[in-house]
């Protein structure tokens, strides 16, 4: 693990909303930050300026069999746009079941969460998945 790699910002891309989380390589944990409207590049820039990440992680929506689905190419394009616009290395991470896991966490907390809160929780789970396994990257 590179010594200077400390902050990671993760995204759960959707056609209407993008969940955002921040993670740290030291703890290998991530925290939900917010949910942004899709294509809100100004807000994304503000978040990246604030957190100064060394890596961006984008959830890759695949079918349960691991094949591309309708949103897969859109998420890949979003990842390429992030890297191109901001010059920060961007990786795609399999996001299968993260939304379901986020709903289960919300149920365990016995508190109803909005769709936007679920999206940012999903972004945290995607980010943590990369943090737990990034040595293989």
What are these regions (language model features)?
Residues 2-9, 15-137:
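Phosphate- and other anionic-substrate recognition elements at nucleic-acid/protein interfaces
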């Amino acid at each position: 693990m590179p010594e200077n790699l400390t902050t990671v910002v993760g995204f759960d891309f959707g056609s209407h909303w993008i969940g955002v989380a921040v993670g740290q390589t030291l703890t290998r944990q991530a925290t939900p930050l917010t949910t942004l409207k899709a294509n809100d590049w100004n807000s994304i820039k503000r978040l990246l300026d604030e957190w100064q990440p060394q890596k961006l992680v984008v959830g890759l929506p695949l079918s349960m069999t691991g094949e591309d689905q309708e949103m897969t190419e859109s998420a890949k394009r979003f990842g390429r746009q992030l890297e191109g616009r901001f010059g920060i290395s961007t990786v795609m991470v399999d996001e299968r079941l993260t939304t379901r896991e986020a709903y289960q966490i919300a149920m365990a907390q016995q508190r109803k969460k909005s769709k936007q809160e679920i999206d940012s929780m999903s972004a945290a789970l995607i980010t943590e998945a990369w943090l737990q396994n990034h040595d293989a990257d």
